[in-house]
């Protein structure tokens, strides 16, 4: 089964639909299977005190201006939906509150996503599980008890899901990846397991692919120097193309695990073993 590669646009569009479409183009041209966004209802997710606090940004001088500037509304998501259908690439989004999930459900995307930060928000998990769409569940900032409960909710709802091993640091240091958790999750929950990476570079993602992940999510950016907290942990277009190309090569290289003589080895074997006239 081919690894399902998700290009996480998140909020790296900076509230600009043109940037969003440029990033969708990059994902499609690179061979990704889907793009993902993030959706928040600002007055639910953040406190009034935080929203009123000072923060310089391209949209104003407080946190509210910055948070609202990064959010897309109905018209933008309608255009994203239309554009992705035109290009033939799936899209979906991770909701950070119930209202946002209900908003997203009107677009009837094929997939849902539980962000690591939301894994312990049971009402949201129950709402998403009730939709019975294939759901990617990131496990960053979570312990076994947290993940057990999330899995229980999805199993009770009979909603298809896969876990995504994740370390929620931005960017993540390679030595923090703990990729052996991929096998731990697979063995404990008897489900498909993917990897959601926030590292700089590609080596950790390649290693995850070799460990048998079924999905891979990486943030993408037009330019890592652009404004935004997620840009530094993102892949620019050239790196994304390199990632997807290498992942597809790794998939082919893994093989089926059967120990046999490759047909291409036979003439070489005859030549190199001719002096003792034996070919296995």
Residue ranges and their predicted role:
Residues 1-280:
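Catalytic cores and adjacent flexible loops of soluble metabolic enzymes
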